[in-house]
Amino acid sequence: MAKTVAYFYDPDVGNFHYGAGHPMKPHRLALTHSLVLHYGLYKKMIVFKPYQASQHDMCRFHSEDYIDFLQRVSPTNMQGFTKSLNAFNVGDDCPVFPGLFEFCSRYTGASLQGATQLNNKICDIAINWAGGLHHAKKFEASGFCYVNDIVIGILELLKYHPRVLYIDIDIHHGDGVQEAFYLTDRVMTVSFHKYGNYFFPGTGDMYEVGAESGRYYCLNVPLRDGIDDQSYKHLFQPVINQVVDFYQPTCIVLQCGADSLGCDRLGCFNLSIRGHGECVEYVKSFNIPLLVLGGGGYTVRNVARCWTYETSLLVEEAISEELPYSEYFEYFAPDFTLHPDVSTRIENQNSRQYLDQIRQTIFENLKMLNHAPSVQIHDVPADLLTYDRTDEADAEERGPEENYSRPEAPNEFYDGDHDNDKESDVEI
C-alpha cells in the first residue's frame, strides 16, 4: 500500500553559502530539488514550503545564550564577539556567514514541521533533505552544524510516541543526537560510521552504550575504511531488524548523510548510490512512521543523485537511469546518469571476521534491553507549530517551477583548481 509522503523544501535554503573553500555547500539542496522536480516525483508527494523555526523552538534543546548569539552574530559584527565565538565553537569549520540564523531557522523548521505532521497522522513519511545536522550540541556548533534539527524534531515526536528510533548512515558518528538522548530509553540511537585514526568526531566506539535509564539504548557500529555495499548490508539489515524487534519503535528518524558514498570529498567508504538507497528502502519496509533527513555529503552532484534516488524509493516510483535535462545538467557530466560508478581504489578494511565480531557484540548488548520500554500516561503539550495547509498545492495543478529559483553564489561548486569537487580529482 502506497504511503502518504510529505516533502519539505524552502526555495531559499540553497542560497546560503558557508564561504569560499568550505566543503559544506547548501546549494546541493537546489540540485536535489531540481532533479526531484524534473523527474516528476513532486506529483507523488504533498509538497510544502516549510515553517521557519523560532528562537523558542531552538531553545527546546539548545541554550538560550547560544541561540541568542547565533541570532545576533554576523560577518560585519563578529569582531565584537571574540569571546562568544570561542565559547560556542564558531569559527573555521562552523563559520559565521550572511544569513546564518535564517539558514538554521529554515532547515530546523522543516524537520519540526515534518515531526508535527507525523504526530498528527497527516503523512506516513516526511522528507527534509535540508535537515540532518547531527553534530550540533546543546551549547555549541560542531562539524558544520549549528542547530540540531534532529534532536528538536525527536523532542516533538516524543509528545505522541513512547519510543523513537534514530538511525544514522552518515560516514560521521551522530554524536550530537547520541549525547542528547544518552540517559533515556525513550530514544534509541543507532549510528553506522567510520571510527578510528582520529576521524571526526572521534566518538562512536562500540562500547558507548548509554547510561542510567538509557544504558544499552545507544548502539554504535564502528566501521573501517572502504566498506562496500555487500559488507554494509551484511551488517545493516540484521542489526536494524533486531533493533526494531527488541525496541518496537512507534516512529523512526533516518539520517541519510551521503558522505558514506564512494568518491565523497570528505569520505572514505565505497557505498554506491543503490547500496545507500537499500538502507532507506529497508527502513521503509517496516511500515513505521518515518522522518527522513539529509546530513553530510560533499561531492554535490552525487549527493543530489543519491537523495533524488531515495526520494523515488520512498514514493515507490521507478525513475530512468538517464538524468532529465535541467538548468544544472552540466554538473552531472560526463555521463549524465543517476548511478555513476562511485567506487574508489580504497581497500575494504572491514573483514568478514571483523564485521561478525561487531554484530555479535551488538546482539549481546541488545539482549540487555527491556523489550519495548513503556512510558506513563501524560498530558500532551501543544504542538510547537500550528498545522496549516496554506502552503500546500495540488500536485496536478502545481507547476514544476513553483516556488523555485536558481540561486548562485560565488564558488558555490568549485573553489579553484584545488577544490576536489572538480572532475580532475575524482573519476565518476
Swiss-Prot record:
Enzyme Commission numbers on file: 3.5.1.98, 3.5.1.-
Region (Disordered): 388-428
Entry's induction text: Up-regulated by disturbed flow in umbilical vein endothelial cells in vitro.
Modification Phosphoserine occurs at: 424
Any single GO CC term annotated in Swiss-Prot or TrEMBL for this entry: chromatin
Active-site feature positions: 135
Domain of life: Eukaryota
Catalysed transformations (reactions): N(6)-acetyl-L-lysyl-[histone] + H2O = L-lysyl-[histone] + acetate; N(6)-acetyl-L-lysyl-[protein] + H2O = L-lysyl-[protein] + acetate; N(6)-(2E)-butenoyl-L-lysyl-[protein] + H2O = (2E)-2-butenoate + L-lysyl-[protein]; N(6)-(2-hydroxyisobutanoyl)-L-lysyl-[protein] + H2O = 2-hydroxy-2-methylpropanoate + L-lysyl-[protein]
Reported effect, residue 265 to P: Abolished interaction with NCOR2 and activation of the histone deacetylase activity
Co-factor requirement: Zn(2+)
The entry's keywords: Biological rhythms, Chromatin regulator, Chromosome, Cytoplasm, Host-virus interaction, Hydrolase, Nucleus, Phosphoprotein, Repressor, Transcription, Transcription regulation, Ubl conjugation
Binding positions for Zn(2+) per the UniProt entry: 170, 172, 259
Tissue occurrence: Widely expressed.
Subcellular location: Nucleus; Chromosome; Cytoplasm; Cytoplasm, Cytosol
Gene Ontology biological process terms in this record: cellular response to fluid shear stress; cellular response to mechanical stimulus; cellular response to parathyroid hormone stimulus; chromatin organization; circadian regulation of gene expression; cornified envelope assembly; DNA repair-dependent chromatin remodeling; epigenetic regulation of gene expression
Positions that bind 1D-myo-inositol 1,4,5,6-tetrakisphosphate: 17, 21, 25, 265
Pfam families linked: Hist_deacetyl
GO molecular function, one term: histone deacetylase activity, hydrolytic mechanism
Known role: Histone deacetylase that catalyzes the deacetylation of lysine residues on the N-terminal part of the core histones (H2A, H2B, H3 and H4), and some other non-histone substrates. Histone deacetylation gives a tag for epigenetic repression and plays an important role in transcriptional regulation, cell cycle progression and developmental events. Histone deacetylases act via the formation of large multiprotein complexes, such as N-Cor repressor complex, which activate the histone deacetylase activity.
Assembly information from the UniProt record: Interacts with HDAC7 and HDAC9. Interacts with DAXX, KDM4A, HDAC10 and DACH1. Found in a complex with NCOR1 and NCOR2. Component of the N-Cor repressor complex, at least composed of NCOR1, NCOR2, HDAC3, TBL1X, TBL1R, CORO2A and GPS2. Interacts with BCOR, MJD2A/JHDM3A, NRIP1, PRDM6 and SRY. Interacts with BTBD14B. Interacts with GLIS2. Interacts (via the DNA-binding domain) with NR2C1; the interaction recruits phosphorylated NR2C1 to PML bodies for sumoylation. Component of the Notch corepressor complex. Interacts with CBFA2T3 and NKAP.
Protein name: Histone deacetylase 3
Species annotation: Homo sapiens (Human)
